[in-house]
Every structure is written in structure tokens, then in C-alpha cells.
Amino acid sequence: AVCSDHVQMCEWRKYKSPMESSLIANDVDQETIDSLMRTVEKNVDLYREYLKLKAKLMNLPKLGNWDIVAPLPNAPDMEFEWEEARREVVESYRSFDDEVGAWVEEMFERRHIDGEVRKGKRSGAFCAPWFSGKSAWILLSFNRKLGDVYTLAHENGHAVHDYLMSRNQKPSNAEIGACIAE
């Protein structure tokens, strides 16, 4: 019923396809979505191989959704110092693009990342854009685990979007579309 209502609404509004309203709302074109889907399809076998290997290592015939993020059995309990995590994250971005790596380094240099674990601070992580400062702020609780390094890298991805957005858009036009938000 919901899908047929949506299709009917799109027909009434003369959209070319049922996706067109979402494309407009997210300021993205069909070509970009098609490219994203081709990239996923091109690489999905690698991800499937990883999942099969993980299931085997976990002694499971098939992974459940909850197993995807579960730690591997007997995996070393690695710990990272803040500076080590910083180096890993910045170098990962630099390996993609030197300029992007420099933006991430700037987040650390400007002390725009609050990773300290302290009493009263909630766990979790988020990145908030700071338009007037042409930057962003990241809040997370860095407990020195590998997952914290991943989270630090992930939130810096949002900061890169915010960095570019604050330099190329007006605040009223700056919302990141759902197709690239995460």
C-alpha cells in the first residue's frame, strides 16, 4: 500500500521515476546513484568472501546480522595511543588524497576532536559542522581500542564533508544528502 501510494503520487507529480523525488531532495542525480551502485556491485564479491571467512573463523555455518560487527575469536586485544590513532587516520586519508589528509590533520591541530574519556561524558560519537569556522567538531570517547580508531576515521569523514560544505555552500543549502551521509 505504501509503495503503490508513492508510485501514484509520483505519477500525479509527473516525476520521471519513483526515485526522482528522492534525487531532488538529496541534490543528487541518477547518474551518481548508478555509479555508486555499479561500484558496490563490482566489489560485493570481496565483501562476501570476507563474510564467509569470518563465519568460518567463528565456527558458524552462516553469519547473523549481529555477527558482522562481532570481534573475531582469539583476535588480539590491541590498544592504541591517541597519537598512534591520529597517525593511522591521517595517513589513511593522505593515501587517498594529500589535501584531504591535510584537512584531517588540521582537525587534530586545531583541537577540534574531543576524544577524552571523562566522568559525565556520554559514550558514542558524532561530528557537528561549524560553518563560521569553516570546519567541524568531533566528539567521541576514545578508549584505545581498534573500533575507536575506526570511529575516529569515520567521524573525520563527516568532518571532510563539513569542511568542503562550509567553503562551497551557504548554511541554508548545506544539508548533506542521505545517500552520502553515512
Regions found by a protein language model. Name each.
Residues 1-182:
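Cation-handling catalytic/transport regions enriched in His/Asp/Glu
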